[in-house]
Amino acid sequence: MAASGFLLIASFMLVLLVLARPLGSFLARLIEGDPFMPLQKIEAGLWRCSGVKNVEMNGWQYALAILLFNILGIALLFALLMMQGALPLNPENMPGMSWHLALNTAVSFVTNTNWQAYSGENTLSYLSQMAGLTVQNFLSAATGIAVAFALIRAFSRHSAATLGNAWVDLVRITLYVLLPIALIIALIFVSQGVLQNLDGYLHITTLEGVKQTLPMGPVASQEAIKMLGTNGGGFFGANSAHPFENPTAFSNFVQMLAIFLIPCALCFAFGQVVGDTRQGHALIWAMSLIFVVAVVVVMYAELAGNPHLIKLGADSNINMEGKESRFGILATSMYAVVTTAASCGAVNAMHDSFTALGGMVPMWLMQIGEVVFGGVGSGLYGMLLFVLLTVFIAGLMIGRTPEYLGKKIDVFDMKMTALAILVTPAVVLLGTALALCTDAGRAGILNPGAHGFSEVLYALSSAANNNGSAFAGLSVNTPFYNLLLAAAMFLGRFGVILPVLAIASSLVAKKRQPAGNGTLPTSGPLFIGLLVGTVLLVGALTFIPALALGPVAEHLQVWLTH
């Protein structure tokens, strides 16, 4: 079993790196503004129709464009979800959502969180799935990548005032990257048996004589961008555990690759654009080290399972509860780590049924900011925030002004870095405290004790870090949780994006200093170790007290009573 686990990890990383390197080179061309000749005429037509001028923006113009674009997206999606009962492509006559669920869902999909307090097959029309959620899956992914593009340009340019054009970046990312790759992935999914139709639901009689309804729908097209854009919102309530979304072991492997593909490619692109490929390789090494250890820990925890099962007459104590037998323990454990290391949130098993230790690792990966490859765009700029913090700490230790890639890191940069790193932990911990201190919050807890606390902590961690997965034992489709989690998702998304763009605006104006004898090398093993240590230390200091009350306490309860 151990050999199979390591073979799965090794094969996944090998295929990922082989695919990500050429994509990284293409992304580097987009960042540097190289024209893509076959689509230049389409671009020009889009600029004319939309009235967009292809001129560069400064940091605040870029931030304002991104913010207004996403707020408009929330408003339009909210209206669509409220009115879906009166709109076409609704063969099952689904009514409009309640206002608080519609608001939660709109904020969720626009912020790339895809938190779902509903089951899609029982709640949404095909129009809402296609024109609402799928469109935002593309646009929210493009938003994250565009912010990463702006930050990369800030490091590669010097003595400049602009970061690119937000509208141009959004269009090019969608047209040149997301749409073509999503089309290829969708065709792979269809070949594996994922649904893609606009038929009404099938009403059948099983061999046992029981009536059953089989949901239909355009699943593959949404599933592709759901994974590629690290969105994670399922067409069905069971998400990628549903055989109509993820039918085979091969489709499961492709889904994991799709989640990490763009985040890994952006690291390669970063190294190429700044003129030192070793910088991108260092980020990949740091991310990979944390990722591999996390996968091994979850595999071990789920294979160790629950020692009380043998006493109760089970054949084995391995934890297969909530898992699909077509995937097994190893692939399920790895999927859980992939989806929470990235800001995806898709699940092929029920995380609420994991062991205490197996469930704690995905929760912790979200809590450290999802910087282990992370979401499309957000993973890279999140890790670069930790790079700046690491450089600052190293500068304090040797008594030098911190610098990274020849750019001096000043007080303003560190204030914005600290703000971006601390905003999501603050939202998570304050939101959890609010939920536990109010009757409305406690009413949603179905499992009392340490696990109930873990469910609330997981929900806020998932929302604030724009992940979207859940410990599903928490009843969240209430006005209290819909509004609380909507606020957490919005603050977690734009409370990081705005400081990141402020940092980019500051860095792009600075001169690049030549490396000297006292310059800290940022591409070697020493810096990689220091970076990993900084990520772990910040995560430990922030969340260990909360984790001790939840999954750690639950783990001790299980094993100390054995």
From Swiss-Prot:
One of its GO terms (molecular function) is P-type potassium transmembrane transporter activity. InterPro entries: KdpA (IPR004623). It comes from the Bacteria. The chain crosses the membrane at residues 6-26, 63-83, 132-152, 175-195, 253-273, 283-303, 327-347, 356-376, 379-399, 416-436, 483-503, 526-546. GO terms for cellular component: plasma membrane. It is a multi-pass membrane protein. Its main location: membrane. Keywords: Cell inner membrane, Cell membrane, Ion transport, Membrane, Potassium, Potassium transport, Transmembrane, Transmembrane helix, Transport. Belongs to the KdpA family. Part of the high-affinity ATP-driven potassium transport (or Kdp) system, which catalyzes the hydrolysis of ATP coupled with the electrogenic transport of potassium into the cytoplasm. This subunit binds the periplasmic potassium ions and delivers the ions to the membrane domain of KdpB through an intramembrane tunnel. The system is composed of three essential subunits: KdpA, KdpB and KdpC. This is Potassium-transporting ATPase potassium-binding subunit. It comes from Yersinia enterocolitica serotype O:8 / biotype 1B (strain NCTC 13174 / 8081). The gene is kdpA.
